[in-house]
Amino acid sequence: MIKLKVKKGDEVVVITGKHKGKKGKILKVFPEDSKVIVSGVNLVKKHTKPNQMSEGGIITKELPIHISNIAHIDPKTGNPTKVAFKFLEDGSKVRVAKKSGEIIGKEGK
């Protein structure tokens, strides 16, 4: 298991694969598999049988994609960027966009 630099709610863009260029927010992170679910990316249709709890039909849902296929969106420029960690004066650790130096995530809002 590797250290992930992504969190739920981060804005990312797909950089490789059939969904290249699509942007979305991270809905769920699977650290043990190094995968994430991104809203609106890697959509599949699943046929479900009816049961006592719900009726059957076709549902559309997102499947996980590997974290190597995504990149953070720079909050300043809107372009893909790498992420670094930085310590602030108060001692807190934050994620920073390498291209612009802007803080990524809730810490920067």
Swiss-Prot record:
Transmembrane segments: none annotated. InterPro entries: KOW, Rib_uL2_dom2, Ribosomal_uL24, Ribosomal_uL24_CS, Ribosomal_uL24_KOW, Translation_prot_SH3-like_sf. GO terms for molecular function: rRNA binding; structural constituent of ribosome. One of its GO terms (cellular component) is ribonucleoprotein complex. Keywords: Ribonucleoprotein, Ribosomal protein, RNA-binding, rRNA-binding. One of its GO terms (biological process) is translation. The keyword RNA-binding applies. PANTHER family: MITOCHONDRIAL RIBOSOMAL PROTEIN L24. One of two assembly initiator proteins, it binds directly to the 5'-end of the 23S rRNA, where it nucleates assembly of the 50S subunit. Belongs to the universal ribosomal protein uL24 family. NCBIfam families: rplX_bact. Part of the 50S ribosomal subunit. HAMAP family: Ribosomal_uL24_B. This is Large ribosomal subunit protein uL24.
